Protein backbone atom coordinates (compact mmCIF):
# COMPACT_ATOMS: atom_id res chain seq x y z
CA UNK A 1 0.00 0.00 0.00
CA UNK A 2 2.86 2.40 0.74
CA UNK A 3 3.79 2.35 -2.97
CA UNK A 4 0.48 3.90 -3.99
CA UNK A 5 0.95 7.57 -5.06
CA UNK A 6 -1.65 8.95 -2.66
CA UNK A 7 -0.24 6.84 0.19
CA UNK A 8 3.22 8.23 -0.57
CA UNK A 9 1.83 11.77 -0.52
CA UNK A 10 0.10 11.17 2.82
CA UNK A 11 3.19 9.55 4.32
CA UNK A 12 5.37 12.46 3.15
CA UNK A 13 3.00 14.88 4.90
CA UNK A 14 3.40 12.80 8.08
CA UNK A 15 7.15 12.28 7.80
CA UNK A 16 7.82 12.94 11.49
CA UNK A 17 5.11 10.54 12.66
CA UNK A 18 5.92 6.90 13.50
CA UNK A 19 4.73 4.54 10.78
CA UNK A 20 4.03 0.82 10.76
CA UNK A 21 3.08 -1.56 7.98
CA UNK A 22 0.36 -4.13 8.55
CA UNK A 23 -1.01 -6.80 6.27
CA UNK A 24 -4.29 -6.54 8.12
CA UNK A 25 -4.91 -3.55 10.39
CA UNK A 26 -7.54 -5.52 12.31
CA UNK A 27 -4.56 -6.82 14.29
CA UNK A 28 -3.86 -3.29 15.47
CA UNK A 29 -7.56 -2.73 16.18
CA UNK A 30 -7.76 -5.87 18.32
CA UNK A 31 -4.58 -4.90 20.13
CA UNK A 32 -6.06 -1.47 20.81
CA UNK A 33 -9.35 -2.94 22.07
CA UNK A 34 -7.59 -5.22 24.54
CA UNK A 35 -5.20 -2.62 25.96
CA UNK A 36 -7.06 0.70 26.02
CA UNK A 37 -9.80 2.02 28.27
CA UNK A 38 -10.92 4.64 25.72
CA UNK A 39 -10.68 2.60 22.53
CA UNK A 40 -12.53 5.15 20.41
CA UNK A 41 -10.31 7.99 21.67
CA UNK A 42 -7.18 5.93 21.08
CA UNK A 43 -8.33 5.13 17.55
CA UNK A 44 -8.31 8.85 16.75
CA UNK A 45 -4.53 8.86 17.24
CA UNK A 46 -3.90 6.39 14.41
CA UNK A 47 -4.55 6.45 10.70
CA UNK A 48 -4.63 3.32 8.56
CA UNK A 49 -4.13 3.71 4.82
CA UNK A 50 -5.81 0.98 2.84
CA UNK A 51 -7.20 0.03 -0.54
CA UNK A 52 -10.99 -0.07 -0.76
CA UNK A 53 -12.27 -3.28 -2.29
CA UNK A 54 -15.66 -3.22 -3.93
CA UNK A 55 -17.96 -0.53 -5.21
CA UNK A 56 -17.44 2.95 -3.80
CA UNK A 57 -20.79 4.34 -4.93
CA UNK A 58 -23.67 3.21 -2.73
CA UNK A 59 -27.35 4.13 -2.74
CA UNK A 60 -28.53 6.25 0.13
CA UNK A 61 -28.86 4.05 3.22
CA UNK A 62 -32.20 5.73 4.02
CA UNK A 63 -33.98 4.19 1.04
CA UNK A 64 -36.82 1.98 2.20
CA UNK A 65 -40.10 0.65 0.77
CA UNK A 66 -42.66 3.36 0.15
CA UNK A 67 -40.03 6.12 -0.03
CA UNK A 68 -39.31 8.11 -3.18
CA UNK A 69 -35.65 7.91 -4.16
CA UNK A 70 -34.00 11.30 -4.67
CA UNK A 71 -30.91 9.79 -6.33
CA UNK A 72 -28.69 10.49 -3.35
CA UNK A 73 -25.62 8.29 -3.21
CA UNK A 74 -22.78 8.02 -0.74
CA UNK A 75 -19.08 7.49 -1.26
CA UNK A 76 -16.99 6.53 1.74
CA UNK A 77 -13.34 7.36 1.12
CA UNK A 78 -12.63 7.04 4.80
CA UNK A 79 -14.30 5.93 7.97
CA UNK A 80 -14.26 7.19 11.51
CA UNK A 81 -13.44 10.70 12.58
CA UNK A 82 -10.75 12.62 14.41
CA UNK A 83 -13.31 14.73 16.27
CA UNK A 84 -15.05 13.80 19.49
CA UNK A 85 -18.51 15.30 19.00
CA UNK A 86 -20.79 13.97 21.73
CA UNK A 87 -23.86 14.20 19.48
CA UNK A 88 -22.36 12.24 16.58
CA UNK A 89 -23.78 8.82 15.79
CA UNK A 90 -20.30 7.61 14.77
CA UNK A 91 -19.34 7.50 18.44
CA UNK A 92 -21.54 4.43 18.81
CA UNK A 93 -22.02 3.24 15.23
CA UNK A 94 -18.33 2.59 14.61
CA UNK A 95 -17.51 1.69 18.20
CA UNK A 96 -16.58 -1.84 17.18
CA UNK A 97 -14.00 -0.47 14.77
CA UNK A 98 -12.30 2.56 16.31
CA UNK A 99 -9.52 2.82 13.73
CA UNK A 100 -9.45 5.87 11.45
CA UNK A 101 -9.14 4.38 7.94
CA UNK A 102 -8.47 6.27 4.71
CA UNK A 103 -8.69 4.62 1.30
CA UNK A 104 -6.02 5.71 -1.17
CA UNK A 105 -7.33 4.22 -4.43
CA UNK A 106 -9.23 7.35 -5.44
CA UNK A 107 -8.55 6.63 -9.11
CA UNK A 108 -10.74 3.53 -8.82
CA UNK A 109 -13.55 5.71 -7.47
CA UNK A 110 -13.22 8.16 -10.35
CA UNK A 111 -13.32 5.35 -12.92
CA UNK A 112 -16.40 3.90 -11.24
CA UNK A 113 -18.15 7.28 -11.16
CA UNK A 114 -17.29 7.96 -14.80
CA UNK A 115 -18.75 4.59 -15.82
CA UNK A 116 -21.98 5.11 -13.87
CA UNK A 117 -22.46 8.72 -14.98
CA UNK A 118 -21.79 7.76 -18.61
CA UNK A 119 -24.22 4.86 -18.39
CA UNK A 120 -26.98 7.19 -17.12
CA UNK A 121 -26.30 10.55 -18.82
CA UNK A 122 -29.83 11.91 -18.25
CA UNK A 123 -29.95 11.11 -14.53
CA UNK A 124 -29.00 13.64 -11.88
CA UNK A 125 -26.84 12.14 -9.17
CA UNK A 126 -26.35 13.66 -5.75
CA UNK A 127 -23.21 12.28 -4.16
CA UNK A 128 -22.20 12.80 -0.55
CA UNK A 129 -18.91 11.90 1.10
CA UNK A 130 -19.64 12.36 4.80
CA UNK A 131 -21.64 9.33 5.88
CA UNK A 132 -18.94 7.60 7.95
CA UNK A 133 -16.59 10.51 8.61
CA UNK A 134 -16.17 14.26 8.43
CA UNK A 135 -14.95 14.15 4.85
CA UNK A 136 -12.91 17.37 5.12
CA UNK A 137 -11.36 16.77 8.55
CA UNK A 138 -8.10 15.36 7.19
CA UNK A 139 -7.99 17.16 3.84
CA UNK A 140 -4.66 18.82 4.67
CA UNK A 141 -3.19 15.33 5.10
CA UNK A 142 -5.29 13.30 2.65
CA UNK A 143 -6.15 15.71 -0.18
CA UNK A 144 -9.28 14.02 -1.51
CA UNK A 145 -10.59 17.38 -2.69
CA UNK A 146 -7.65 17.66 -5.11
CA UNK A 147 -9.14 14.66 -6.93
CA UNK A 148 -12.86 15.12 -6.38
CA UNK A 149 -13.35 18.82 -7.07
CA UNK A 150 -11.87 18.76 -10.60
CA UNK A 151 -13.87 15.62 -11.40
CA UNK A 152 -17.22 17.00 -10.24
CA UNK A 153 -16.49 20.49 -11.55
CA UNK A 154 -16.33 19.43 -15.23
Regions found by a protein language model. Give the residues of each.
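Glycine-/small-residue-rich active-site loops that bind phosphorylated ligands and cofactors
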Residues: 2, 80, 136
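A structural signal for short, well-ordered beta-strand segments and their strand-loop junctions
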Residues: 20-21, 74, 86, 128-129
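N-terminal [4Fe-4S]-dependent radical SAM core
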Residues: 26-77, 92-99
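Short cysteine clusters
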Residues: 81, 85-88
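Conserved Radical SAM active-site core
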Residues: 50, 54-66, 90-154
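A short N-terminal interaction module
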Residues: 1-28, 39
Amino acid sequence: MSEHPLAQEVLSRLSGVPQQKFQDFSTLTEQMKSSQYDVFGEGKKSLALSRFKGSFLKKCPGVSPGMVCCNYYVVNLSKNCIYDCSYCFLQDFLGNNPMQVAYVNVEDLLVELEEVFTQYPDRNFRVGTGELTDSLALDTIIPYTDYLLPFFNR
